[in-house]
Amino acid sequence: DTVNAA
């Protein structure tokens, strides 16, 4: 899984 938070 890939999670990006900005």
From Swiss-Prot:
Protein name: Unknown protein 5 from 2D-PAGE
Further comment found in the protein's record: On the 2D-gel the determined MW of this unknown protein is: 15 kDa.
Organism superkingdom: Bacteria
Species of the source: Fructilactobacillus sanfranciscensis
